[in-house]
């Protein structure tokens, strides 16, 4: 792995990143240091990008069953700028507000990117959460139907954003489970 040119982050940039994210100054500096170690040689960190493979290989994401979706949602055309990485870390931080976490969870779980979490999406979510590819079709349908019966308020066999938001607002574990400590900061 290459290294960026060792430019220190400007004080003004650090203040701006703090104002625009839910990250502390130390977390931003820690992420900056990690980014510098991963980015291509000879690039200034604001001009450098990381691939989805580089980001998904970070220890905190490597074990996440949704790492491919997380990377897809937060990257731009499969590449991560430093600001993309900061945005991702901010959403998954403990300080991020519930509405922001719910918005990004919806985007991550909308596998087919049709603006809804439909039966196909729910089945993929269930299989990934249970780490199971050999679940019986009947059990998978039962679990999918149970989720829909609890959350699909208009009975159209899919969750709109507002239905998903309503369901997550009632879930006491959501805020605790939608956190990732990427950088060991």
Swiss-Prot record:
Interacts with ITGA2B (via C-terminus cytoplasmic tail region); the interaction is stabilized/increased in a calcium- and magnesium-dependent manner. Ca(2+) 2 binds at residues 152, 154, 156, 158, 163. Coiled coil: none annotated. PROSITE patterns: EF_HAND_1, EF_HAND_2. Keywords: Calcium, Magnesium, Metal-binding, Repeat. The keyword Metal-binding applies. Ca(2+) 1 binds at residues 110, 112, 114, 121. The gene is CIB4. This is Calcium and integrin-binding family member 4. The keyword Metal-binding applies. Residues 62-95, 97-132, 139-174 form the EF-hand domain.
């Amino acid at each position: 792995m290459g290294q960026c040119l060792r430019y220190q982050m400007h004080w003004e940039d650090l203040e701006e990143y703090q104002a625009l994210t839910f990250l502390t100054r130390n977390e931003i500096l820690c992420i900056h240091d990690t980014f510098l170690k991963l980015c291509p040689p000879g690039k200034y960190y604001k001009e450098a990008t990381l691939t989805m493979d580089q980001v998904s290989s970070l220890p905190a994401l490597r074990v996440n069953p949704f790492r491919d979706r997380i990377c897809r949602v937060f990257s731009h055309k499969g590449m991560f700028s430093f600001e993309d990485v900061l945005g991702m870390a901010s959403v998954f931080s403990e300080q991020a507000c519930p509405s922001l976490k719910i918005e990004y969870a919806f985007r991550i779980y909308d596998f087919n990117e049709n603006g809804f979490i439909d039966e196909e999406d729910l089945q993929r979510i269930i299989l990934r959460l249970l780490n199971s590819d050999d679940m019986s079709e009947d059990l998978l349908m039962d679990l999918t139907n149970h989720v829909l019966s609890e959350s699909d308020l208009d009975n159209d066999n899919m969750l709109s954003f507002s239905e998903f938001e309503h369901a997550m607002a009632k879930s006491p574990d959501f805020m605790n489970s939608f956190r990732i400590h990427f950088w060991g900061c």
